[in-house]
Amino acid sequence: MDFKNANELLTLCEEKNLPVSEVMRIREIELGETSAEIVNEKMTRVLEIMKDAAFSPIKQPVKSMGGLIGGEARKLSLHAQEKKGLCGDLLQKAITYAMATLETNASMGLIVASPTAGSAGIVPGLMLAMQEHYHFSDEKIIQALFNASAIGYLAMRNATVAGAVGGCQAEVGVASAMAASAAVELMGGSPKECTFAASTVLMNMLGLVYDPVGGLVEYPCQNRNAAGVANAIIAAEMALAGIPQLIPLDEMIQTMFTVGKKLPAELRETAMGGCATTPSACEACHMCS
């Protein structure tokens, strides 16, 4: 069982009467010539790593290697405990876990690139927040991760997830699309609604540049992971409400790729434009001088 694009994925889902997650899981088993047990064990390990990367910085903040971030997730957690937050429980936890994961990455901790290190907080941020908020089992979250991986696979096969090629839209944008699709399936949405959510996300983040201060995956990457997880919730909610997406996911992936290639090199991970060249950023980071 294999698919090259979202249209083929939806056809398989309809023909086999399966959710996106199960089509992707079977694909991994068949193409990897392995067993269901091994594939499930690997995804179980993925979830374990995600949990540790998201929870550890909240308990014990660590400064990043570049010194630009560290402790933000704990501040968000404490703020939530004071009951003064603007966000509801789900979004508050999601942005906290997303930012925490970036702290783990920036301090040389173990993370799951989903699909990249710079966007690694979005999928676990939303999945772990939904698990706590809705009391989903690990098995349900693991299944949702297979759904997310299907969207990531489509972006990698037909476009890019590299910021150096497509800008931050290809990293944070794709990660947000993965999370949105997984969230839709978790809440009982259809395969088509999953692709609607993913397409909406990419549309909302189209053209986002990659401008890491000092060339480090710290700032503004951490903030954008928080924005990405919020974007995923918005897109998933719209899809679940029955709002269709005019532009299919396959077309949106191609559009993202086209726009990314048109971005100047200064805005594609070179730290030569955008936030990276502001006076305040350069003053804060000795690597900019």
Show which residues each predicted segment covers.
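Alpha-helix capping and helix-loop boundary segments enriched in small/acidic/polar residues
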Residues: 85, 114-117, 139, 163-171, ...
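Generic N-terminal targeting/processing segments that precede catalytic cores or assembly contacts
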Residues: 1-109, 133, 242, 249-289
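Acidic-glycine-rich active-site phosphate/pyrophosphate-binding loop
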Residues: 88-105, 140-159, 203-212, 271
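Functionally critical mobile loop/hinge segments
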Residues: 183-289
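Alpha-helical support elements that line or immediately flank enzyme active sites
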Residues: 124-135, 180-188
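Glycine- and acidic-residue-rich phosphate-binding/metal-coordinating active-site segment common to enzymes
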Residues: 145, 151-164, 168-178, 183
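Conserved phosphate/anionic-ligand binding catalytic regions in large, soluble enzymes, centered on
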Residues: 108-126, 170-175
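Glycine- and small hydrophobic-enriched segments that form the cores of compact globular domains
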Residues: 86, 113-120, 132, 136, ...
